[in-house]
C-alpha cells in the first residue's frame, strides 16, 4: 500500500476535506484562484508571494476521485486525484473549479472529474523547509504522456503555476487544513 500524504498537523489528507496548498519557501505563499482578463469565471491558478500585490491567505481546495477507491478517503502518494477549488460561486461558474493544464502548460480551472488528462499526483520530497516536514511536489499526469512537475512562471506579470519539463524544477508545497 502506498504511503499517505500528510498535512502540517501530521494528519493524512482526506478526500473531500478542505486544504490550503502553500509554498513554504521564504517569499512563497498559498495557491489561489484569480480572474485575469475579465473572464466570466475566474480561472487562473496563482501563488501568493511576499510582495504587497500578491499577499493573501489562498483559496481552499478539496481533493476528489472519479470513483470509490480501495484507498478509502485518504490521499496516498502518486495516486491520481482531481484538485478542485472550494469557494462560493455563481451557478454559471460552478463547473469552473477543477484544475487542469491548458495548451500553454499553465494550471487553470475548467477541468473535469473523470477526464484522464486532468489528473494530478502528489509526490513526497526529502525537503525540510523552515521546520516543516511533509513537503511535497505536485505532478500533472496526462493519460499516456507521463507526469510533469508543477513549477511556476511569471506569465504576464502574474505568479502562475505551470507544468514544467525539467525534473529538478518544481515548487515545494505543504498542505494546511483550511
UniProtKB/Swiss-Prot annotation:
InterPro entries recorded for this chain?
Kunitz_inhibitor_STI-like_sf, Prot_inh_Kunz-lg
Question: Where is this protein primarily located?
Answer: other
Q: Which cysteines in this chain are paired by disulphide bridges?
A: 41-93, 141-147
Alphabetically sorted, this entry's keywords are: Disulfide bond, Protease inhibitor, Thiol protease inhibitor, Vacuole
Q: Name one GO cellular component term.
A: vacuole
Keyword Metal-binding applies: no
GO MF term (any one): cysteine-type endopeptidase inhibitor activity
Instruction: Indicate the transmembrane segments per the record.
Output: none
User: Keyword Secreted: yes or no?
Assistant: no
Highest taxon listed in the record's lineage: Eukaryota
Q: What does this protein do?
A: Inhibitor of cysteine proteases. May protect the plant by inhibiting proteases of invading organisms.
Q: Which family does it belong to?
A: Belongs to the protease inhibitor I3 (leguminous Kunitz-type inhibitor) family.
Name of this chain's protein: Cysteine protease inhibitor 7
Q: Which organism is it from?
A: Solanum tuberosum (Potato)
Amino acid at each position: 500500500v502506498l504511503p499517505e500524504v500528510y498535512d502540517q498537523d501530521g494528519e493524512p489528507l482526506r478526500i473531500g476535506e478542505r486544504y490550503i496548498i502553500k509554498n513554504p519557501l521564504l517569499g512563497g505563499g498559498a495557491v489561489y484562484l484569480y480572474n485575469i482578463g475579465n473572464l466570466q469565471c475566474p480561472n487562473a491558478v496563482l501563488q501568493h508571494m511576499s510582495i504587497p500585490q500578491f499577499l493573501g491567505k489562498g483559496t481552499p481546495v478539496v481533493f476528489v476521485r472519479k470513483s470509490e477507491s480501495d484507498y478509502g478517503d485518504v490521499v496516498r502518494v502518486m495516486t491520481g486525484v482531481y484538485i478542485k477549488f472550494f469557494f462560493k460561486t455563481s451557478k454559471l461558474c460552478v463547473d469552473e473549479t477543477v484544475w487542469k493544464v491548458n495548451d500553454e502548460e499553465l494550471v487553470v480551472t475548467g477541468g473535469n472529474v473523470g477526464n484522464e488528462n486532468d489528473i494530478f499526483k502528489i509526490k513526497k520530497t526529502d525537503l525540510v523547509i523552515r521546520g516543516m516536514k511533509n513537503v511535497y511536489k505536485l505532478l500533472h499526469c496526462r493519460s499516456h504522456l507521463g507526469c510533469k512537475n508543477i513549477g511556476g512562471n511569471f506569465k504576464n506579470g502574474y505568479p502562475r503555476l505551470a507544468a514544467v519539463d525539467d525534473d529538478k524544477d518544481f515548487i515545494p508545497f505543504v498542505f494546511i487544513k483550511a
